[in-house]
Amino acid sequence: MSDQVKTNHKTTAKERPFARAIQTLRNVGLRPTRQRMALAKILFDGANRHVTADSLHEEIDKANITISRATIYNTLHQFTDVGLLREVVVDSGRTYFDTNVTDHHHYFLEEEGCLQDIPDGALTIGLLPEVPPGKKFSRVEVIIHVAKDS
């Protein structure tokens, strides 16, 4: 009887489509609101990716989900603050959010306007300047801008 009860009460990810998003948010101390769950599901239920607030807003619209740009922007920054995303500033007018939060570097493909991860081990950083007194390096981040070869 107990085996039958266990079998009947099992839940799977297919039965609970937001289970992973809810757990991800709770693990970092964020309340799983409807907007956060929708954004977490889109951002984290798949391969690592780079998004902007605008590209995410377009994706949300195509999925017939109503979330304001301001809420998307605020949520991206909340996710960054708790370590779920990494903010990558390409220039003063272009910020991307990366779901891969490990230390790694990027190509910025200028023609396409997108980021691409540089494979591990493809970039070696040699001599670094001295750190100001009382400071230490926290991270070295390289973004290589790539233009069309004409």
Regions found by a protein language model. Name each.
Residues 46-51:
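Short capping segments at the starts of secondary-structure elements
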Residues 82-150:
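Non-DNA-binding regulatory cores of transcription-related proteins
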Residues 1-45:
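Intrinsically disordered, low-complexity serine/threonine- and proline-rich regulatory segments
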Residues 52-64:
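DNA-recognition alpha helix
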Residues 38-41, 55, 74:
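Amphipathic alpha-helical interaction segments
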Residues 72-82:
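Basic amphipathic alpha-helical segments that dock to polyanions
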